[in-house]
Structure formats: C-alpha cells, structure tokens
Amino acid sequence: MIRKLVALAALAASAPAWGHIVFAEPEGQAGSYYAGFLRVTHGCGASATVSLRVEIPEGVLTVRPQPKPGWTLAIEHTPLARPVPGEGGATIRERVSAVIWTGELPADQFDQFGLMMKLPDESGALYFPAVQTCVEGRNDWTTIPADPARWHDAETPAPILTVKPAAAGHAAH
C-alpha cells in the first residue's frame, strides 16, 4: 500500500510537466555545444500536431536543427546589429531566430525535435517559446516566468534550458 502511495505521489508531482514541451536534456554547459531534443508529448486535445515553431533566444548565435523524415524544415534568420567573430575565423552576420517543423504527429503519440547549438558563455536560463499548431487548435508554450525556479507553476511555460557555468579549464568543442 505504501509503495502505491509513493508511486502515486511521484506521479502527481511530475504531472505539471507531463504536457509541457520540454528539453529531454534540460541542462548544458556555458560556452559549449549542446545537442538536445524538444519533446512533444501530445496534440491539442484529440487533434494531431501539424507544426512546431520554436523561437531561439538572442544569446544563441549558432543553431542547427535536425531534419525529420516526413517533415519539412524552415529556418528564419535575423540580422545581427553588429557582426561577431564565429568559429574558424568566420564572421556571424545573422542568427537563427526561429525553427519550424511541419508534418504530422498524431495526438496519441510523442516525438522529439532536435537542435544543436553553441551555448552562450554566460550561465542562466534560456527560454525557447514554442507554438504547437494542430489540425484543430494550437498550444502556445510561450510563458516566461520572472523566476526560472517557478517554471513548473506556469500553465503554458516556454521550454527552458538551464546553462550551467563552464567547468574550470573548459574549452568548447
């Protein structure tokens, strides 16, 4: 009986995040490359997901989305106010501002949408507002709480990636 209560309590504690779009790997290291997946666990009620649009935070300059078989991929760019040095001597003049996957994901299935990116040198919370469009309806996962520790309290929180300080002697690869 106690095991059942403990399991039920654990399930209840995790319930608020069950329906949110989340990063499968919720932490990365400042100044390093991060490859992770945004997990979409349901549609809009019984309606299939047909598009996922993810906004990329301004501090992230290098992003490469992962293509998905059967889905189309669109990448939106925004010019930088001032060019910055990039990898291998290149100059970065624009950044990826949004990634949009279009396809079909039945409401009773889940999938993951991959992003590889160079994280900023500063630690802290990065939010990736996402709009999940369905055959009927949509979910706007765009709420950014004033306090990252209160993320789970938001009804429709933007996916969050926590950037941890770089380890001493860390070199980005």
Residue ranges of predicted features:
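N-terminal edge beta-strand
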Residues: 18-40
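Extracytoplasmic/periplasmic copper-protein system
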Residues: 30, 133-173
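Low-complexity, serine/threonine/proline/glycine-rich extracellular segments that form mucin-like
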Residues: 33-69
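Low-complexity, intrinsically disordered segments enriched in Ser/Thr together with acidic residues
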Residues: 96-124
